[in-house]
Swiss-Prot record:
GO terms for biological process: translation. This is one of the proteins that binds to the 5S RNA in the ribosome where it forms part of the central protuberance. InterPro entries: Rbsml_bL25/Gln-tRNA_synth_N, Ribosomal_bL25/Gln-tRNA_synth, Ribosomal_bL25_b-dom, Ribosomal_bL25_C, Ribosomal_bL25_long, Ribosomal_bL25_short, Ribosomal_L25_dom, Ribosomal_uL5_bac-type. This is Large ribosomal subunit protein bL25. The keyword Kinase does not apply. NCBIfam families: bL25_bact_ctc, PRK05618.1-2, PRK05618.1-5, PRK05943.1. PANTHER family: RIBOSOMAL PROTEIN L25/GLN-TRNA SYNTHETASE, ANTI-CODON-BINDING DOMAIN-CONTAINING PROTEIN (PTHR33284), RIBOSOMAL PROTEIN L25_GLN-TRNA SYNTHETASE, ANTI-CODON-BINDING DOMAIN-CONTAINING PROTEIN (PTHR33284:SF1). Part of the 50S ribosomal subunit; part of the 5S rRNA/L5/L18/L25 subcomplex. Contacts the 5S rRNA. Binds to the 5S rRNA independently of L5 and L18. Gene3D superfamilies: Ribosomal protein L25, beta domain, Ribosomal Protein L25, Chain P. Residues 197-208 have a biased composition (Acidic residues). It comes from Psychrobacter sp. (strain PRwf-1). The keyword RNA-binding applies.
Amino acid sequence: MSDILYTVNGITRTNDQQGKGASRRLRKQNLVPAIIYGGNEEPTAIAIKKNELWKLLENEAFFSNILTINLEGEEHLAVIKDLQRHPSKGFAMHADFQRIVKGQKINMQIPLHFTGREEAPGIKAGGILSTLVTDIEIVCLPSNLPEFLEVDVSNLEIGESLHLTDIKLPEGVVIFELDVDEPVDRTVVNMQAPTVEEVDTDAEEVDAADVPATEQGSEEDKGE
């Protein structure tokens, strides 16, 4: 885990600032309602300045790093676990943060970064790299939390693929789907053959209506 890069400044919400109606009023004041839970403590309802949170959300690493949440001088270590956005405008409407407890493992969604694309034999042969998974759930101690996982595709030939078990993991990190009773080794990325553009047969077919009619049965016509 890298040093803590992001600090979220919030205020504790009072009882009359909680609930759907109160949340709407907070948003009108350019505040985003949020909650911090976990860590053997009671959940704490908070509010965060909309513009400040918006800037933080622009960074991919914000979603996979341990954060400092500053509540009126009291600091909490946490990770973001859920974010609700406006369905059409995209701005944050509510955020959930989970407290970090030293020595206690956490589940986190981590982005995958694909490297070596230009060096891949399949790309050089005209193939198409198709990424099927862009992030995965991992389990680890907070001290081992990676910002992202790297997937090297530099050796992929056309027709080949990489699975979850092919991802190199840092020490102390496991993939949740592979650490269960019935693991599922999903395909993460594959190299597809170049698509051959189908010939537009309709365009090549001659429209009978556009062809001048030929004299048919000319012999019969002559006999009439």
